[in-house]
Amino acid sequence: METWVKAPFLKEASVLIIGECIQSAFPKLWDEFAKNRITLTSCPQAEGFSGLTEKLATLIKCSGPKEIAILTIDGSPHCNMLHASANAASFLTETDIPTKHLVIAREGDVRELSSETVRLSRYLHLVEKCIQRCPDLIDDLGSLSLEHRSAERRRTQCLMIHDESEA
């Protein structure tokens, strides 16, 4: 996120922080969400959690934006970091700036997530608890994640080999 955190245009502005890859992957969504907002780009993979959090906290302290919206790709661990950084920056600055967590889901539809959803994603034992209570989430995951489908294929192949060796 390359900007001076005290830039006059940030003072009490509506700020959109958007994953860098979105402009090329979803240009119409970029245009739609950038309307009437100061738009900053970030590549969480390149910038890292600590750097992003520090930059966001400093921006909040120095410029006091009216609101912050984060728009990223759903399913990207790097993009998840941008949402977590926004929550951490609010915590560190002890401010309650309205924050929207937005993700571009499959087929390009945008979904708003609560700050609590972002926080929950950091606690894997709680995510596991959610899966145990709602196992059909794994079916949903299968429709979204190539990694999951590949792991399931390998697991099935191992089970078949194991069954053949016992026969």
List where the protein language model places each region.
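Iron-sulfur-associated redox domains of electron-transfer enzymes in respiratory
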Residues: M1-A167
